């Protein structure tokens, strides 16, 4: 959980005065974005490796300790654990980076309106699932989400699907970030 907070703060601070300094020193927006993405990947990879090793060792010596991956998918598969955590950290970093870029790009009033609209969409989605959609549709959506996270109908776990899901979500957020950074002016 501490790593989530660190990666989130890193993502939020990934766009700062460094952007203005790099633009003024001749770096292109593409290189700035690639450098930021590389920084997130390097730090996320190291942190996920450390969390994987620490989580598995702690669970081995203290069976009451559980890591996030261990609770969801179980222990024993270290490589999927490391890749899953890496992609999860990349997803969190990309989400916060996109948020920081959007807040910087939009003015304060528009940013607040966007936050209120997103909160309204979450409440609307909850209301749709609870009161509007039929139980069959909700069950199909739940089944799709379960399969996207790797849980198959026979009780087996497919590690490829959650890795692809996390990768695609992170890629969407990074593409959104790149689209914003391409149009951002230096203030």
Which residues make up each language-model segment?
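Helix-loop-helix units of permease transmembrane domains in multi-pass membrane transporters
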Residues: 15-41
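Short, membrane-exposed interhelical loops at transmembrane-helix boundaries
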Residues: 69-70, 135-158
